[in-house]
Amino acid sequence: MPRPFRFGVNLVEPAPAAEWRAKCRRAEELGYDVLLAPDHLGSVAPFPALVAAAEATSRPRVGTFVLNAGFWNPALLAREVATADALTGGRLELGLGTGYVQQEHEQAGLPWGSPGERVDHLRRTVEELDRLLGSPEHRPQAVQRPRVPLLIGANGDRMLRLTARHADIAAFTAARSVPGSATGLVPLGAEELDERVALYRELAADRAEPAELNLLLQIVAVTDDPAAVLEPLLEHVPGLTLEQASALPAVLVGTREQLVARVRALRERFGFSYLTVLEPSMEAFAEVMAGLRGA
């Protein structure tokens, strides 16, 4: 039996208190299972935003998607995680990554290490969080045991190894970092993503419990005119054709029926049962979710 679908929305736009609560309630009404906050300069501070999201809603879980480990001291992060889990009634999911925007580190006056150094820092952070939050002497205490569910966003070999060892949720962006590109990331095609997921499964083969697999959908649009929606992407990725863009795993553009079929195919081919969309796609993807409930 395939794992049931879960759907999350990453609420990337800051908002005043009443507007923030209203959009969290709207996401709950639309059927989202997880309300998420990013960790970028210019976005909301994740933990207070998630506590407010939990207070405004009753059903969805809340989570970071994903924290930049380079912004955080592990001991201070453990305090934030435990407090947020307690204040949300045990609804928190912790998403971690290495960060990929050098300019944000420079703005914050924080060192920007090599890729290997950033992975090492993330590994130390995960291990220290497990030690601190697993200790009965740690104050404050999280609600969830043995720990708050951990999501790690990964693509490279070392990150996939770390994810296989530690994460309850393995998150794939279906993109890779490329210095000098317009966004810092370029999308992965289906064959490249096949290889990344296959490597993760190999590295995770000895796990007692299989992890949930997550995919971040970068573009979602219910439309009869895919070319109009995808034109900006074609401008950002030289050499990418409309046909290739339409087939990218992280791009869902087409009619509602086509997108429902695409989401089912993502789970069948790659194992992605937990799908996350960005806030601008929240309403559009809700149309697709309606065709997948109970699947």
Residue ranges of each PLM-predicted region?
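Active-site-adjacent structural elements that line small-molecule/cofactor binding pockets in enzymes
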Residues: 1-295
